[in-house]
Amino acid sequence: MTTKSFDVVGIGNAIVDVLVQADDAFLDNHNLTKGTMALVDEGQAERLYASAGPGLETSGGSAANTLAGIAQLGGRAGFIGRVRDDQLGAIFAHDIRAVGARYETPAASSGASTARCLILVTPDAQRTMCTYLGASVGLDPADLDLEMVAQAQVLYLEGYLWDSDEAKQAFIAAADVARSHGGKVALSLSDAFCVERHRESFQALVDGHVDVLFANEMEITALYKSNSFEEALEQVRGRCAIAALTRSEQGSTVLSGDQTFTIPPYSLGPLVDTTGAGDLYAAGFLFGLTRGEDLERCGQLGSLCAGAVVTQLGPRPQCSLPDLLAQHLG
């Protein structure tokens, strides 16, 4: 695996985030459930933006955030995701390339505009997302750079894209190429509502194609309709080689075969915004995994990266991640 050109290649939604600080009343007035992601059409997105107030514009997308984190750590990262040839598409492409990730998916010249996500951050640091998927949902097998996929130690798939039939086909095609070339396949479940919409097909994907599964407590219990986190642990155990399951302030649990590792969280400052926590956990974990670190160390790397990003507004760390690792993990 050391001869691969990329440590991790990710496939996901190419989105520009608009982060806005809001209160619970705003969520109630717009019938939004705190801490979840809701899909909206372009008209709904425009109305929400107009009423939300000024925001911070930054490139996002769950898998894109993870790959940006891996690149910031010094890993060799590539990303596949569709944008339109518009202003937001140019912003997305510039930002992910600027952190050192390879991004060469051609921009669409017609059709829906580049995806955007309004992220409402409440005073308790919870984020509630309203996402217009736009051009990103049009990703299909023709958009895949299969040479890049074949050259990845790990192919990382974003569960949010599972809402698109074309993207499902792209996922399966990419996973088959990755595995046939000796790579591993990792999946992030992304959102509990997304899991509930596609429970059976997600279970089949995990059982048949996934080596490393990332999920939070809500997502993993939704996947197996479990009554508790502990029950979900036993249901996922053995279905894939590795499961890395995050639990917010309770840290994370990493499973592999009969092994179970409990990873404490890192508290690096006041909690500001949890938007990129899961994405950066996956970045740290996969960075460690592609360097041959043991699973407990991988979990610690993920926990530290997540601990850093939640102390700031926005999903991509503004601090030096290599310096952070050197300071806390040696």
What do these predicted ranges mean?
Residues 1-80, 90-91:
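Glycine-rich phosphate/adenosyl-contacting loop at the front of the ribokinase-like
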Residues 95-112:
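A glycine-rich helix N-cap at a beta->alpha junction
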Residues 154-234, 250-252:
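Conserved beta-alpha-beta core of the PfkB/ribokinase-like small-molecule kinase fold
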Residues 1-9, 14, 28-34, 177-180, ...:
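Conserved phosphate-binding/catalytic region of the ribokinase-like
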Residues 104, 108, 119-164:
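Conserved phosphate-binding/catalytic loop of the ribokinase/pfkB sugar-kinase fold
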Residues 77, 103, 185-186, 243:
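Hydrophobic beta-strand scaffold residues
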Residues 67-76, 120-122, 288-291:
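Alpha-helix C-terminal capping segments
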